[in-house]
Amino acid sequence: SGIDIALWDIFGKITGQPIGRFFGGRLREKVMPYASLLMDEPKIMNANLTELRGQGFKAFKIGWGTFGRIDTANDELLVKSARKVIGDDCFLAVDAGGSDAYWRGNLRWAINASKMLADYNVGWFEEALRPDDLADFIELRKQSPVPISGCEVLTRRQSFTPFIAERAFDIIQPDVTKVG
């Protein structure tokens, strides 16, 4: 992937064109950048969120850390705390980090977590399950009140096909450094 990205960069520089033009051009005029940070102990996370809010960020993704790894009270404390710090006027997404080799979250946990996240107006719930758990992602998407995202760790187009065909996600997130 690194070589592929570098070659496209060189091609864009040689032609004097943004490489997006070679892939069909601009789809929108603006994108929403978001600050991404670990769900650390609330005091530390809140300090980081406050600093990032002060830098002008209006969208945030909090993830990994202890979320889904201790208990549901801890999960809600983290999300409630983040929402309080950034306010209701900011976008908030949550990444459970289900691609972690030691991830224990299951479908029941993910459904319950998604309902809790809806209470805090979370924009999407990312990696709520292990990355290859197609059947559970399909069921989670059916039951979740918040959009479900994933596919970040998949590396080949064939890996994406069943998730797309079965509509397992509301948001597909390929990582260009992994898929080439």
Question: What do these predicted ranges mean?
Answer:
Residues 57, 122, 168-169:
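A structural motif
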Residues 1, 72, 103, 127, ...:
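Hydrophobic alpha-helical scaffolding
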Residues 59-61, 126, 173:
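Conserved beta-strand positions in the central sheet of alpha/beta enzyme cores
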Residues 25, 65, 98, 128-130, ...:
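Residue-level "edge-of-site" marker
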Residues 1-119, 135, 143:
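N-terminal capping/lid subdomain adjacent to the active-site entrance of alpha/beta enzymes
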